[in-house]
Amino acid sequence: DPGGILRQVYIGKRTPAVARVVARFEQERTEFSADREGIQRLCAQLRAGGALITDTASARVLKALADSGVFQLGGVLIGTHAFTVLGNMLGLRWTSAALRTQDVDVAMNASVSVALPPLQADIPKALESLEMGFLPVPALDVKHPSTSFKVRGKSLRVDVLTPQSRLRSRKPVLIGRFNVAAQPLPFLEFLIEGAEPGAVVNGGGVLIQVPTPARFALHKLIISRERQAALHGKSEKDLSQAAQVISVLVDERPGVLQLAWEAVEKRGAGWIRRAIAGIDAIKRVNPMAHEKICAVLPVARTRRART
């Protein structure tokens, strides 16, 4: 079970059919053990080769969520832990200042695709199984359910998020397939659309879903301009992460950045305005990244010519 908890299951009296099931289970368990050892060796090689490593506590949480089926049922890892995964996917090491966090942010759509099986992944149960002391964080409005879980006295925290609807309601949304409430946030549907598989590297590997690098970068540009003045540090972190990803994409995958920009344009003038403001802000944080994005995105190049 999630958290490595052993569970006994009674499958009936011993019969030839049951004996075959047991034999097949033992064979598959042996094969799984061999696969797990291979993954652990691979992760050790990645660590030795300089891959970005997720801290042990966060990796335990992500493994429990993955084991419970969260990422199979549409959950997407976002935030700084996703940034770490993207670094390994792109074969790069990010600056350490942009990697500091113990916040585990998981986003999902409130409605489920008909292509997904009618299964459930119980997030509160998965966190409880870890026996790390996770407790629900009370909402500011006592009438609303919690959308976060935190270990008392520590910085480790899990936030559950969902795209904000067109009605712009910030009221938590109950998501039945995860047995949890999620906090609606604007611009999130752009980020998690078309998410792709990735791996968290620690002592072993954890398969998860992360945003595409291009959407991750453009989303960071947009939300950096939405941060309140009190969150200036987070805004700077947004810009730093966006600049680093953009620098790589312009050199190696300019087409995917252009496609992601077209997706921004389809969402209207407000989205374009915020994204351009983010591009302007990058010039202060990383002038080279600003030059690169202006060379690839026509709207940024035109704006630079005007200024």
Regions found by a protein language model. Give the residues of each.
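Compositionally biased terminal segments of proteins
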Residues: G3-T307
